Amino acid sequence: NLSVEVNGDIFHNLHLFANPIDKFRPSDKEIQRALKKKKGSNLIYFGPGVHNLPNDTLFVPSGTTVYIDGGARVYGNIFTEGAHDVNIFGRGEVHPDGRGAGVWVRRSKNVRIDGIVVSQLPIGQCDSVELTNVKSISYYGWGDGMDVFSSSNVILDGVFCRNSDDCAAVYASTQGFKGGSNNVLVKNATLWADVAHPIN
């Protein structure tokens, strides 16, 4: 991961990310089944191009994989809400219409997210969530990267955060989430806080 800066200007720089080989990309057959909405497909696929979510929102059901392909830019919010066994993979981007979280993981269990680029990715009242090779970039106030609220067994591995607030913060009961947080691991991470703290 590189930051290309001209004359020391860190606010108008270019971020270059080198990704590992994508081992989660679905087969062409699986993609075609998803695009045709064939019965039995548990894949939601976003191909290269711009995608505007209906009502700016996608709630991911349990047992579903969302794949955001390289070159895809999804506008809106992707939620796992009260779900389990959810995967969000890819090399594309998710951005809300304006400020806020591109992906929200709430009251869910067994969620894995790999490779995508988001504005923010908070985790609230969850168990067993793993983020690998995820990039979070925000430029606005209160633009925390990957906050963890009242959650257990959370791994942030190989993530990159460039945020205009805390990059990663761990909280107990707050913002409508109840309970403590435990077994939260941040490793192999690059945390670049323009404001506030890399870890709070």
Predicted regions and their residues:
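Beta-strand-enriched, solvent-exposed domains that form extended recognition/catalytic surfaces
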Residues: 1-32
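An acidic-aromatic substrate-binding cleft motif
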Residues: 22-48
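Short, T/G/N/S-enriched strand-turn elements that build extracellular solenoid repeat scaffolds
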Residues: 31-37, 52-61, 75-82, 102, ...
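N-terminal extracellular ligand-recognition/capping segment immediately after the signal peptide
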Residues: 41-80, 92-94, 118
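Right-handed parallel beta-helix
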Residues: 63-65, 70, 84-95, 109-119, ...
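Conserved mixed alpha/beta catalytic, RNA-binding, or beta-rich assembly cores of soluble enzyme
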Residues: 77, 146, 185, 197-200
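Glycine-rich phosphate-binding "P-loop"
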Residues: 97-103
